[in-house]
Amino acid sequence: MKKIALIIGSMIAGGIISAAGFTWFAKEEPPAEKTSTAERKVLFWYDPMYPNTRFDKPGKSPFMDMDLVPKYADEESSASGVRIDPTQTQNLGVKTATVTRGPLTFSQSFPANVSYNEYQYAIVQARAAGFIDKVYPLTVGDKVQKGAPLLDLTIPDWVEAQSEYLLLRETGGTATQTEGILERLRLAGMPEADIRRLIATQKIQTRFTLKAPIDGVITAFDLRAGMNIAKDNVVAKIQGMDPVWVTAAIPESIAWLVKDASQFTLTVPARPDKTLTIRKWTLLPGVDAATRTLQLRLEVDNADEALKPGMNAWLQLNTASEPMLLIPSQALIDTGNEQRVITVDADGRFVPKRVAVFQASQGVTALRSGLAEGEKVVSSGLFLIDSEANISGALERMRSESATHAH
């Protein structure tokens, strides 16, 4: 009986000791998980889409269908930039790109238009009064060759001057007198071929033929046989067809990239098989006040006259700048008041920096200043980081530093 009681007592004592030991070990276990989460002090909650609006408790954003994000006290720092939970940056697909140095390439097509070459333009006039004897079968739009007859006419003043010339020759007039009469005929517009014929034949001519002075297309011609013609009346207007002009309007912001004709590729929808040769180009000095564009004029060979004035054309401009600092265009934040990027420093902090933009093309932006080659900039997921920088005061510190450097 005593033995049984001793065994039971030993079991009870062992249970008490085990319970006490478990209690002691439980008290000594460090509450690591609890301190890692519960002890982080939350300053406020906010919606990244509206970072300036703060909330005192978690929940759904009243602006967007998303959970509010906590702002922790241990994230506050006087250092430049902000530090963001890597889980958040990964979930939002934050990506970075390296600032590089290289040429900014530009390639764009511009609508263009074919027109007459205004340097090849002739006006045929009657420099003395007379009347039209014959009009050759021509009209506006007809092509003529140099020397082709346009009309026959009689001009009394020319007939009278010829009579004076022949009279001087017969009466022994001096060379100076006869040459003076011939010069008067030239100034009155009598064709040189008719003057030579007068000298050779010594006979008065009463009918004269006005001819085309150049190859081209008639753009004005409205005369009929029997009509009187006054001094200085326009008989015809003729435009040359080789070369022609092709003009295009280009933005004034890319004028600095236009350097030589090798940058241009010209195509005409009406003749897609034709290879066009550009003789020379000119960037006209005037800027269109409404569109802020410059007129680019190309002089194009047109020996076969395949290019017709009024045709549509396309001008492809391919060019590149000198080496410059380049970043992806999506890395740029342009508020209208300032342009900035988010850089990543050696400690992994996101630091906003102001930049000066020079030009952008094909998804790449060239910078004047603000960054150095090799720096890292955020190219995707900018919104969260920029909002965080705004909340943490990093943007204000950036602006203060910029103002200090400016002074």
From Swiss-Prot:
Summary of subunit composition and partner proteins: The cus efflux system is composed of CusA, CusB, CusC and CusF.
Listed GO MF terms: transition metal ion binding; transmembrane transporter activity
UniProt name for this protein: Cation efflux system protein CusB
Superkingdom, taxonomy of origin: Bacteria
BP GO annotations: copper ion export; plasma membrane copper ion transport; response to toxic substance
Entry keyword set: Copper, Copper transport, Ion transport, Signal, Transport
Similarity annotation: Belongs to the membrane fusion protein (MFP) (TC 8.A.1) family.
Induction behaviour: Transcriptionally regulated by CusR in response to copper and silver ions.
UniProt-listed PANTHER family: CATION EFFLUX SYSTEM PROTEIN CUSB
Pfam families reported in the protein's UniProt record: CusB_dom_1 (PF00529), HlyD_D23 (PF16576), HMBD (PF19335)
GO CC annotation, single: outer membrane-bounded periplasmic space
Function recorded in the entry: Part of a cation efflux system that mediates resistance to copper and silver.
N-terminal signal peptide: 1-26
Organism: Escherichia coli O6:H1 (strain CFT073 / ATCC 700928 / UPEC)
